């Protein structure tokens, strides 16, 4: 009985200790180890308010650290500046200035960060900071100087990888990450960086593979969930992407983030995008790109042009974005200066050492040749990437088809163009080219069928029928030429050329009949009221 009572008392004591431990507030170090920086700030501010900071040291220094890791770089900068001005700074002035310079770098104040860092004694950390700042300021000479001072240690290799990434040298960045992993395999956060590199390279399956490795250690990471949804979206799995995003909707802090608003808009087929995307330009990196794409899809080329007109591109994707907006707008208003800029921007990307052998670089070079009417060269570049899976496969196929058509490769051009007839990017221009190719492939009846689906009494339809009339006449299909000219008489009453075409087609057809050839008139496809 005594033993039982002692056991019961002991168990009750352990339960009370366990309950007390549950109710005990964790130390700020525990919060930091969990990367719960908000929790750490709360504890630190409480300790500071109760003047119980003996075990903490300088609470403000830790609060600045937590703010920095929360992305609150301005708050961190203010604290470091205040600490430097205080009577008894917790660190020497050089260290505090270095921390201030790092905050400036993250705030985009590259010039200020560089100016401050160059006044400090050289250290590996200051060298990495200056290496980054010079990269962003495009100071190549200084960049090389700081590059030579990088050591073969993990921190410097990570800095080098970051600069490679910013310059879209994703393969080189991956090589740096692999080197670091060989030395420090426990750095699972590198898997996230590698996943992002593969995403940028368009290898979405490989990106998912590294994301899974990362999420084994950080399942609740917003960044990884966002990237995972993006890989699904790029693979055309819209529903899966939206489902992943919806899992985060219960968190009010996440729902309010610009990146969440942007991606939800993107995954819901750009519903209300015209209202959601403009305020996000300059905040979310892809917002400008998607807004320009939206305007181009809607045929609002002037709006697309205005979005990028004052924007200075820094990386290849930004150059091609601005080039596309300029190309569409320049062709619409027939402005050669705008078109020349588009051609030059495409050439810059296509001829660069970093991009010349990538899908982006080859498409850019093809576009540059396309704008100058050098379709043979454009076709050669497009052919080299024809079998590689691409994000905008329809747009690629339409452009490739036109290049093939312009170089008289009728059969191949026709096959590829017909495969994307249902695309939202299939325009009246493509329909007209399809009609031309069908006639050249001796399928005039099918070319005539295009008129059935065309918008009646529009300028595009008149152009289509003119092409059909002229191509049929050139191909000796005089009955179709006559019928097309007859329809043009109804559509374009102001022109007398169509009557002449009817006369010529009828005379030519009668001559063929006289020679014994049987001519079958085309079916009536449209009667004006």
Swiss-Prot record:
Top-rank lineage group of the source organism: Eukaryota
GO molecular-function term, one example from the UniProt record: intraciliary transport particle B binding
UniProt entry keywords in alphabetical sequence: Cell projection, Cilium, Cilium biogenesis/degradation, Cytoplasm, Cytoskeleton, Flagellum, Repeat, TPR repeat
TPR repeat residue numbers: 57-90, 154-187, 189-221, 285-321, 359-392, 428-461
Biased composition (Basic and acidic residues): 11-21
Gene3D superfamilies: Tetratricopeptide repeat domain
Region annotated Disordered, chain positions: 1-21
One GO BP annotation of this record: intraciliary transport involved in cilium assembly
Principal location: other
A GO cellular-component term linked to this record: ciliary basal body
Keyword Cytoplasm among record annotations: yes
Localization annotation: Cell projection, Cilium, Flagellum; Cytoplasm, Cytoskeleton, Flagellum axoneme; Cytoplasm, Cytoskeleton, Flagellum basal body
Homology family: Belongs to the IFT56 family.
Function text: Component of the intraflagellar transport complex B (IFT-B) involved in flagellar assembly.
Protein's recorded name: Intraflagellar transport protein 56
Source taxonomy: Eukaryota, Metamonada, Diplomonadida, Hexamitidae, Giardiinae
């Amino acid at each position: 009985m005594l033993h039982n009572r002692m056991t019961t008392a002991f168990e009750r004591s352990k339960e009370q200790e366990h309950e007390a431990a549950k109710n005990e507030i964790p130390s700020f170090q525990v919060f930091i180890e969990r990367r719960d920086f908000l929790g750490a700030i709360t504890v630190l501010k409480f300790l500071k308010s109760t003047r119980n900071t003996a075990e903490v040291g300088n609470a403000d220094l830790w609060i600045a650290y937590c703010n920095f890791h929360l992305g609150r770089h301005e708050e961190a900068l203010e604290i470091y500046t205040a600490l430097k001005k205080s009577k008894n700074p917790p660190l020497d002035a050089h260290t505090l200035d270095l921390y201030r310079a790092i905050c400036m770098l993250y705030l985009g104040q590259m010039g200020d960060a560089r100016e401050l860092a160059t006044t400090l004694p050289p250290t590996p950390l200051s060298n990495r900071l200056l290496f980054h700042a010079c990269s962003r300021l495009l100071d190549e000479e200084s960049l090389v100087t700081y590059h030579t001072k990088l050591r073969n240690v993990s921190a410097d290799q990570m800095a080098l990888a970051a600069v490679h990434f910013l310059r879209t040298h994703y393969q080189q960045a991956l090589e740096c990450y692999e080197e670091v992993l060989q030395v420090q395999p426990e750095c699972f956060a590198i898997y996230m960086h590698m996943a992002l590199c593969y995403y940028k390279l368009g290898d979405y399956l490989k990106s998912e593979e590294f994301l899974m490795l990362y999420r084994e250690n950080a399942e609740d990471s917003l960044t990884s969930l966002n990237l995972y949804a993006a890989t699904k979206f790029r693979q055309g799995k819209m529903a899966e992407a939206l489902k992943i995003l919806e899992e985060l909707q219960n968190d009010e802090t996440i729902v309010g983030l610009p990146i969440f608003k942007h991606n939800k808009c993107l995954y819901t087929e750009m519903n209300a995008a015209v209202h959601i995307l403009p305020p996000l330009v300059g905040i979310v990196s892809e917002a400008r790109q998607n807004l320009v794409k939206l305007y181009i899809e809607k045929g609002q080329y002037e709006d697309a042009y205005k979005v990028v007109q004052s924007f200075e591109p820094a990386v290849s994707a930004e150059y091609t974005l601005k080039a596309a907006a300029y190309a569409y707008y320049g062709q619409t208003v027939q402005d050669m200066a705008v078109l020349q800029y588009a051609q030059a921007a495409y050439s810059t990307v296509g001829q660069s050492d970093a991009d010349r052998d990538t899908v982006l670089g080859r498409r850019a070079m093809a576009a540059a040749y396309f704008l100058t009417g050098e379709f043979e060269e454009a076709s050669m570049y497009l052919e080299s990437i024809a079998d590689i899976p691409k994000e905008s496969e329809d747009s690629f196929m339409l452009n490739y088809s036109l290049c093939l058509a312009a170089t008289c490769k009728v059969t191949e051009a026709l096959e590829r163009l017909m495969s994307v007839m249902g695309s939202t990017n299939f325009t009246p221009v493509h329909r007209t080219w399809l009609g031309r190719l069908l006639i050249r492939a001796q399928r005039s009846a099918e070319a005539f069928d295009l008129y059935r689906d065309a918008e009646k009494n529009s300028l595009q339809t008149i152009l289509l029928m003119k092409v059909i009339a002229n191509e049929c006449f050139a191909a000796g299909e005089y009955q179709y030429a006559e019928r097309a000219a007859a329809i043009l008489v109804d559509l374009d009453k102001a022109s007398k050329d169509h009557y002449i075409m009817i006369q010529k087609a009828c005379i030519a057809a009668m001559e063929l009949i006289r020679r014994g050839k049987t001519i079958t008139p085309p079916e009536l496809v449209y009667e004006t009221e």
